[in-house]
Amino acid sequence: MRPFQFSKPRFLISLVILVACGFAATAFAEEPKEWLGKNLDDLVSLYRQFHASPELSFREEKTAARLAEELKKLGVEVTTGVGRQGVVGILKNGAGPTLLIRTDLDALPVTEKTQLPYASKVSAKDKDGNDVGVMHACGHDIHITCLIGTARYLASHKDDWRGTVMFIGQPAEEIGAGALAMLDDGLFKKFPKPDFGLALHVDSSMQSGKVGYRAGYILANVDSVDITMRGKGGHGAYPHTTIDPIVQAAQLVVNLQTIVSRENSPFEPAVVTVGSIRGGTKHNIIADSCHLKLTVRSYSDKVRKLLLEAIKRKANAVAAGAGAPEPMIEFSDATPATRNDESLVS
């Protein structure tokens, strides 16, 4: 997984500034692109600092503190600790609508191997106690920089717009828990409920300088599935005396691929990916269990339901065919699809 590069970051930050100002703007005294050209070096430096100092989900203490510090410098009213590490900044500028601009804060348990001068050298314990590298491999460092750049422009060009801007630093996006934590902590009870919401996500598959957007679905439902295939362990030289969970897991991996290709309509986007298989400890020992971790992506509720029910059915069928106990199946990290408001996008 390669990091996102700041080859042409001006397009990302300009996009946010233009849309943020556009909801209540007059003529610009200074065009956002002109301002960005003057301030780009400082923003790139800021990005590299965030990139070199990543933090895992719900551990974003330094990241949240730095975001809060940058916003306070601009005269933004800042509240920290919303939903644990969440940051809320309010910039008021007269009567007008309220716009929410949001960034995610957390990084991934990925070891960086880019050899860049600002590469992450951070390591940590994951939730299972394993030693892992930590990296902004999903571009949240860029997202934070875009938000700060937008805040700097808006704070220094108040004659160009009217209204209230709410800047949100959301923790734990990667585990699908941070937004809910902020809502449960009274986000829209303690602070204004916005008329509009704006966010972006970098995409390394797009040509540098291009921006992609559309009305309707833009990001998929995300479901995580943990499956434990159970069996009867024993010696590898006597497999006939065992019920091999690793063979079950192998069969299940293949069977799962027929859900998308044979049970789902080709006109409905869907993905079922097995990201991890773990079972056994030695060459000559058949384990008692084998664990699989899946990610499931879809847009509609109908397809989402089809995929999850089919996964459960196929796992149970494999176990039954092997004469094994029923597998343990856990669904978690459910995050609904993002659907862009057609009136705002068109």
How should each PLM-predicted stretch be described?
Residues K73, A250-S346:
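Metal-dependent amide/peptide-bond hydrolase catalytic core
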Residues A119, S123-M135, D141-I142, L154, ...:
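Histidine/acidic-residue-rich, glycine-tolerant segments that coordinate divalent metal ions
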Residues M1-P9:
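N-terminal secretory signal peptides that target proteins for export/translocation
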Residues E30-H136, T145-R162:
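Acidic/His- and Gly-rich active-site-bordering loop/insert found
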Residues T79, T98-R102, M166-G169, G197-A199, ...:
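Structural recognition of the beta-strand scaffold that forms the well-ordered cores
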Residues L40-Y47, A64, A68, A151, ...:
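Extracytoplasmic/secreted envelope proteins and their assembly/folding machinery
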Residues L12-A24:
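Bacterial N-terminal signal peptides
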